[in-house]
């Protein structure tokens, strides 16, 4: 589980640019696609954000609402085969209450079939805009 966050102001100039500007925090644990592919739609994603000092539910839902990995890989410019060790972001759920900045982000991916959960969190330091 990881975060593909962006710089919202930079998004006005280009989504790819805004994504390249931000690091991608990723859980130190992972699951192989082969371990979850047969029940992908049942996986549950949840995120909390600390906004103005309050921890709030930010995103929640099943991966059934996202494109399956095989579909995304088939659309890949280099073809569907990914090099060993590749990590791929597969989309995101809508932000409950809309996108808003926060001081902390916590995320989890729960596998109800195998009874396990990946978790990760990070703090956000907003940099001042200087000219």
Residue ranges and their predicted role:
Residues 1-87, 94-131:
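Catalytic-core "active-site belt" of small-molecule-metabolizing enzymes
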